[in-house]
């Protein structure tokens, strides 16, 4: 989950667990660790890492996240962990950056959601905006794993969200 620090400036990613079938409320959740799982450290992340989405591939936990606040611009990064507590970024650059000026995601590529389909393919759904959040679009890209994480453009891209 993502939460701000006590000064309400930096958004950081923490980890928690709860028993199956619990409400995962304040009294049901338990911290995974004392430390923060991921905090903004790179220039493009600004003061915010949020919207964590994970997928497990070959025993590694990949965490996709939005870096920087909405439309400042937000871009998508990726970190990896063997234990779900200690994460390292796969790159110092965004995995999915904002688009060029005038494109559907020039203000933001953010709020990722990772999904593995029945065939084992992994897709990353995310939102984009070209007008500082007045209009939002949803896109889907396929993720390939190997010696590095690669994003492939898929057949569904930049559909307007109602």
Predicted regions and their residues:
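Beta-rich carbohydrate-recognition and catalytic domains
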Residues: 1-47, 55-107, 116-162
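Conserved beta-propeller blade repeats
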Residues: 52-53, 112
């Amino acid at each position: 989950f993502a939460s701000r620090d006590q000064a309400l400036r930096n958004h950081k990613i923490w980890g928690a667990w709860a028993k199956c079938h619990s409400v995962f409320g304040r009294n049901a959740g338990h911290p995974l660790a004392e430390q923060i799982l991921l905090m903004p450290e790179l220039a493009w992340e600004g003061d915010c890492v949020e919207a964590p989405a994970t997928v497990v591939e070959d025993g590694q936990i990949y965490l996709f996240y939005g870096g920087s606040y909405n439309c400042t611009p937000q871009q998508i990064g990726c970190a990896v962990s063997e234990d779900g507590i200690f994460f390292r970024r796969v790159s110092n650059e965004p995995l999915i950056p904002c688009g060029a000026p005038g494109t559907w995601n020039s203000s933001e590529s953010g709020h990722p959601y990772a999904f593995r389909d029945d065939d084992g393919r992994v897709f990353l759904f995310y939102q984009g905006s070209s007008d500082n959040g007045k209009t939002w679009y949803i896109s889907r890209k396929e993720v390939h794993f190997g010696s590095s994480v690669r994003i492939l453009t898929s057949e569904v891209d930049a559909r307007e969200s109602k």
